[in-house]
Amino acid sequence: MSSSPGDSGGTMLHQFRVANKMSRSIYDKMFVFPSMLVEEELGAEDTVVLLDDFIGTGKQVIDAWNLSFSELVAGAGTVYLMVVVARRRGREKVQAETELVVQTAHELNDSDDLFGDDCLHFTADEKRALKKYCKRANRTEPAGFGNCGLLIVFSHRCPNDSVAALHASHSKWRGLFPRNG
């Protein structure tokens, strides 16, 4: 969830409509752009559902909520944020700092942090080798934004909470799923 145009929320809305056989124009009235929510004159009996792909640290959602979304949905009864994947700590932070009710299909925990002690998918030697590559990709955030250490990639983009080796790009490194360019 972001207040920036062209973010992943639009991609998720399109995929949701196609997956649920709601892409025909007869369903258009059920879906509005976030900027048009204020025109809906929402009341306590109204429910708003926002769609997105991912919550990592929760910072992007909280910033967007504080910047504009809290005003756009003011007066609505319940506001849900439905995401495909959420990191547990990020989801909890969003729910504590906003009025959003977060629903997720897949929740990640500490064992999903590639470099964390709870991650059993890689040996200590493998983690050291991977960390070396991630530091080459991004010295300041080798484990990704918020030090999440995730291995998450979507068809439309790789979150910056994923390890840097996946998405970072510069003159000495090109990630497998670059975020820019």
Predicted regions and their residues:
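PRPP-dependent phosphoribosyltransferase catalytic core
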Residues: 4-9, 15, 66-181
